[in-house]
Amino acid sequence: EIYTLSLHDALPILVDVIDVGIAEQHALTASAGMAFAGLHPVVALYATFLNRAFDQVLMDVGLHRAGVTIVLDRAGLTGTDGASHNGMWDMALLAHVPGLRLAAPRDEAGLRDALRQALTVDDAPTVVRYPKGALPEPMPALRVEGEEPFGAVDILLDSGRQAGEQELFEQRAPLLLVGVGAMAPAALEAGRALAAEGAAVQVVSPRWAVPVPDALVELALGARGVLVVEDGLVDGGIGSQLRDAMDDRVEGGGPACAPPVVRVGVPRRFLATASREEILQECAMDAPGVLAAARRLAERCQ
């Protein structure tokens, strides 16, 4: 009750709040029915509990292109909530739902924008995910690539252009670091360290991660190496989806070959209960781990 009332307070445009209890499957099926009746339901779940309702997302909401928005609290690593509560599966799972769009905001302003944008979509499901606790500090973009809102990719760092070395930048393709959602700060920290060492590097953050934006594919194909950092399952996650999209572009008559893609994320195993910081360090997903992976990629792509 407290959870649903707080949601109602945050979204005064809501007509009503329905607490279905611990019945995620029913919540999704009921929301599809509400959408068919002309409403736009918002379903609030812990990310890990969406797993048990995947069939309803796929067959009741996705198949019928119902305008339902799902907001996933505690997405990514939750640490001391316990091994069962890590919301690490959603991006890999939901990418298989045709027509579904998923946003992974990196800060509070992005979260608010993503929710507003999701509510404008009435012919497909939308998902907005955010981590446990406070979102990272505001991270303004230098510029935006792609079409807003769903194809927009924010450029957070562009070392060659920022330094005024346009000619050098054009002669040397950059490393591209992609920070998905709450992992954008780690990607940006690694990018700044590489830039300080003289590397040409871009750090970007897609506002909507599923499907992979065309602008992100273009940026990746123009890089000499790509590193994707995400707080979800690495197998089938955003890095895997980007790599597949790049390969499809090559096979469709694009560039002769695609640059290498390194994926940093949660490995395919159950994680022991620990603090979020300890798990990030264990999985080499903290800032030092991301920087080490970026340096290995830079050496490989010299």
Region locations from a protein language model:
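A short, small-residue-rich loop immediately preceding and capping a beta-strand
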Residues: 16-19, 37-48, 68-71
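Structural motif
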Residues: 20-21, 44-45, 105, 178, ...
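Short, small-residue-biased leader/transition segments that mark boundaries at the very start
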Residues: 2-11
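Hydrophobic beta-strand scaffold residues
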Residues: 17, 41, 68, 101-102, ...
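Alpha-helix C-terminal capping segments
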Residues: 12, 30-40, 60-65, 96, ...
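Thiamine diphosphate
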Residues: 25, 50, 63-86, 91, ...
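Glycine-rich anion/phosphate-binding loops
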Residues: 49-55
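Conserved glycine-bearing catalytic or ligand-binding loops at nucleotide- and phosphate-handling centers
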Residues: 104-121
